[in-house]
């Protein structure tokens, strides 16, 4: 069973020579905009293997010489896969860490001595406790020391690093503001280990680990930029779409203290290691025509023309030969003969993505429509990772499908329970207890006792405590109720609303369980029952919590099994991927775009607002200050504005989709 098919989704196939050049000369040509040595790999696993190869070589060389190998290690999602690869080599007895000395790059401050949120705990969980590093060779800053001892502790940390001969390597991730370790914007290139105030943007980013900003400690004790730059080698890692913008600035931008990671440009052996998604905005990947000759696919031509339109502020049909020549696109003139021919081709391609009939228009010529006319009506399954992703990402399209008489089913893949605040549970429990008092004269002892139990739990709840199973169940019920109300508003019968409660989600923690065959079996059973003609799945694979990717993997794995089994229904089924909660599709990838009127956009907003627990006080709103309905409207309006700027029809908003073809 293939459980990672989402990782094989390639929307823009980047020629190998642009990320894995064969010679130094080729690398110099395509990377001339880059100011740090950057290695790009097709997958996270390949990138991690590269880093692990370098680390293994260094450790073994030090062992051969009878020396320590000294590492400064960061924590987080970017570096964890590297640690997994190193652990794998240890477990296969390919590598020992007995001569390794580790310095934790930063620690939160202040912390209680018994605090469970220490960064060293994360480092131990993901790496140190899984290999043979001696306990006496692990050093960390102490987040529980008295404030007056901080300066001496930081000075001692610097001295201890020097005692071991300095750092051989630093393995770091990067924050959204370009921070490395806990060095916030404004940090000096000469800065040493010190206490630093955690900035507001970093606090928002840390919500992924702490549930709310309020739980994030106010400060960190961190190795300084100057300390990290003393390492013989520095690896900076980043994976996924969400890191692509900051990595472009760090790699191709100027050195500035507002992006501390740019100081790595001064290091003689700093190496940035990215997957293709994280490298998406580098010039050689996003605009390859600016650094080399290209193999011009339809998507690359569309991307180039949209870029040109935005750069010189012209619609497609007004682009001239001169515009092409002056902006590095003369190859297209040779390919198409003239700007006019290229303009018409791309204009028509974009025009054909627009449809007001997402389920196909019955009894109409569908030659140039994104969705086929028959069969009509269609059976449709919309898979929603959380109980609100459906309306956030494609609420307008769902209403259009219902109004056009298609048989629409909503499948909510997870309970979404940990994304409900404790106050919501308290509010509902007050109501239930009051209902018991008013209409049952408090005779229902189960309700009365459960009310007291939950009230007591919340009163005594401490930092790091996990909710009880009963509380998680109540939180799940709250989200189910909201989803049902939204479906009723959108005229979807409740017997077409399916709560799948995939097992991987039910860890009760931010970090989920691995997705397994049990999850796939639940999805597959629904598909076998409905036998859909259309499937909609989340394409928001940049979701910072990872739930969207796992949910999509479960659906794609189920489809894969049905394909292997020769399921008849799949032969007449199209699969569409949506975005909207965390990102939007790039215009060169859009294959169907559904326009929304002002009234339809307002109805979409109303659908989202039915999910009251996900408004202002909800945990995990991510790094975006806007509420989900605001994000959705802004993205949908931006897509419509982009089409308008290119000279196509002007709409209030648009929802975009990309077709997935089973691998």
List where the protein language model places each region.
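Histidine-anchored nucleotide/phosphate-binding helix
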Residues: 82-93, 390-415, 419
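N-terminal glycine-/serine-/threonine-rich phosphate-binding loop
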Residues: 2-70, 366-367, 374
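ATP/nucleoside-binding phosphotransfer catalytic cores, i.e., glycine-rich phosphate-binding loops
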Residues: 2-12, 22-30, 232-328
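Metal-dependent de-N-acetylase/amidase catalytic core
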Residues: 203-211, 215-220, 312-381, 400-404, ...
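Glycine-rich anion-binding loop/nest that anchors nucleotide
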Residues: 171-173, 209-251, 258, 274-275, ...
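Glycine-rich N-terminal segment of FAD-binding domains in flavoprotein oxidoreductases
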Residues: 61-94
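Class I SAM-dependent methyltransferase SAM-binding "motif I" and its flanking Rossmann-like core
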Residues: 181-225
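Ligand-binding beta-strand-loop-alpha-helix segment within the catalytic cores
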Residues: 21-35, 95-169
């Amino acid at each position: 069973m293939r459980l990672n098919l989402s990782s094989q989704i390639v929307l823009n196939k980047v020629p190998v020579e642009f990320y894995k050049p064969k010679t130094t000369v080729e690398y110099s040509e395509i990377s001339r905009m880059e100011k740090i040595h950057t290695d790009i790999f097709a997958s996270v696993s390949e990138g991690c293997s590269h880093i692990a190869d370098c680390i293994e070589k260094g450790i073994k060389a030090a062992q051969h010489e009878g020396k320590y190998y000294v590492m400064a290690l960061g924590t987080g999602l970017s570096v964890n896969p590297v640690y997994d690869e190193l652990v794998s080599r240890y477990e296969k007895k390919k590598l020992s860490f007995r001569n390794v000395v580790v310095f934790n790059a930063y620690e939160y401050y202040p912390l209680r001595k018994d605090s469970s949120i220490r960064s060293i705990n994360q480092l131990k969980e993901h790496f140190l406790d899984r290999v043979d590093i001696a306990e006496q060779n692990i050093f960390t800053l102490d987040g529980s020391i008295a404030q007056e001892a901080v300066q001496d502790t930081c000075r001692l940390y610097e001295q201890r690093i020097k005692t071991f001969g300095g750092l051989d390597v630093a393995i770091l991730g990067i924050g959204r503001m370009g921070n490395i370790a806990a060095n916030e914007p404004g940090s000096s290139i000469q800065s040493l280990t010190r206490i630093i105030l955690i900035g507001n943007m970093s606090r928002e980013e840390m919500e992924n680990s702490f549930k709310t900003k309020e739980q994030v400690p106010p400060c960190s004790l961190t190795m300084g930029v100057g300390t990290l730059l003393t390492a013989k080698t520095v690896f900076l890692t980043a994976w996924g779409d969400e890191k692509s913008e900051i990595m472009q600035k760090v790699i191709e931008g100027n050195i500035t203290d507002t992006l501390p990671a740019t100081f790595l440009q001064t290091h003689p052996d700093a190496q940035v290691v990215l997957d293709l998604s994280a490298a998406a905005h580098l010039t050689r990947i996003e605009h390859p025509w600016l650094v080399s000759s290209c193999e011009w696919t339809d998507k690359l031509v569309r991307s180039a023309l949209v870029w040109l339109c935005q750069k010189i502020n012209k619609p497609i049909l007004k682009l001239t030969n001169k515009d092409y020549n002056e902006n590095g696109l003369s190859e297209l003139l040779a390919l198409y003969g003239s700007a006019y021919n290229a303009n018409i081709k791309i204009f028509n391609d974009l025009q054909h993505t627009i449809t007001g009939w997402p389920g196909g228009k019955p009894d109409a010529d569908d030659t140039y429509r994104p969705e086929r006319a028959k069969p009509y009506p269609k059976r449709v399954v919309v898979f929603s990772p959380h109980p609100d992703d459906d309306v956030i990402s494609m609420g307008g399209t769902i209403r259009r499908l219902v109004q056009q008489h298609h048989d629409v089913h909503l499948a909510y893949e997870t309970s979404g329970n940990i994304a409900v605040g404790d106050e919501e549970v308290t509010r509902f429990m007050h109501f239930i207890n009051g209902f018991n008092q008013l209409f049952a004269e408090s005779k229902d002892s189960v309700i009365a006792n459960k009310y007291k139990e939950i009230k007591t739990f919340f009163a005594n709840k401490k930092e790091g405590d996990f909710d009880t199973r009963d509380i998680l169940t109540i939180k799940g019920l709250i989200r189910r109720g909201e989803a049902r109300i939204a479906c009723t508003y959108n005229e979807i019968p409740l017997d077409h609303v399916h709560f799948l409660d995939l097992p991987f989600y039910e860890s009760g923690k931010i970090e989920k369980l691995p997705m397994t065959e049990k999850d796939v079996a639940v999805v597959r059973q629904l598909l076998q029952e409905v036998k859909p003609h259309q499937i909609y799945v989340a394409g928001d694979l940049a979701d910072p919590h990872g739930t969207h990717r796992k949910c999509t993997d479960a659906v794609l794995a189920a489809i894969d099994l049905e394909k292997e089994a020769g399921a008849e229904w799949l032969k007449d089924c199209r699969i569409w991927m949506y975005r909207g909660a965390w990102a939007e599709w790039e215009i060169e990838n859009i294959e169907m775009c559904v326009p929304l009127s002002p009234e339809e956009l307002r109805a979409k907003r109303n659908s989202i607002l039915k999910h009251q627990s996900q408004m202002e006080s909800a945990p995990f709103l991510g790094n975006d200050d806007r509420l989900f309905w605001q994000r959705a409207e802004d993205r949908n309006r931006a897509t419509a504005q982009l089409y308008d700027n290119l000279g196509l029809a002007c709409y209030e908003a648009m929802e975009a989709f990309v077709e997935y073809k089973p691998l």
